[in-house]
Amino acid sequence: FFSSRRRHTRCLSDWSSDVCSSDLDYDFVLIDCPPALSLLTLNGLCAANGVIVPMQCEYFALEGLSDLVNTIKQVHANLNPSLTIIGLLRVMFDPRTTLQQQVSEQLMAHFGDKVFNTIIPRNVRLAEAPSYGMPGVNFDKSSRGAQAYMQFGAEMIQRIKTM
């Protein structure tokens, strides 16, 4: 699979090399990949130094996580040796749901420190923001969801600095 895909993963990887070697002064470049393990996602993994996995605490997401982790390991071994998992971010979380609490506990037990402390709650204001053409953190800065994303941003930066 990976040997036949090697030539298809060069475009974004070449772009990221150009960005890093240019005079542009970026602290971070975020590549938002689709949730499916497609060629687009593979390109993103080849161009990235690290992966943040947003994950709903639900049964099927937990099953898909093992496939994603295996893919990340394969990309690391065959295409991009600098790729690492920065962490897992629990999103759309509803603490009233027993299953979500159980899946969250399983994530913590299996991945430990790789799981970010910040949890992004299920939040109506975040869900409404795209229909107004705005990012959730700008749409309603006082919402629980926006506050959680701001907290996550600070936690992410701190984690990357200590890697």
Where do the PLM segments sit?
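Single conserved hydrophobic/aromatic residue that forms the stacking wall/gate
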Residues: 1-20
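Soluble or luminal CAZymes and related metallo-dependent hydrolases
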Residues: 17, 99, 144-148
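Active-site donor-binding loop signature of nucleotide-sugar glycosyltransferases
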Residues: 11, 118, 122, 141
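C-terminal boundary of histidine-terminating zinc-finger modules
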Residues: 130-147
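Conserved catalytic-core segment of NTP-binding enzymes
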Residues: 23-124
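Short, amphipathic alpha-helical "lid/cap" segments that border enzyme active or binding sites
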Residues: 146-157
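Nucleotide phosphate-binding site architecture
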Residues: 2, 121, 127, 137
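Generic C-terminal helix-cap and adjacent flexible tail
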Residues: 158-163
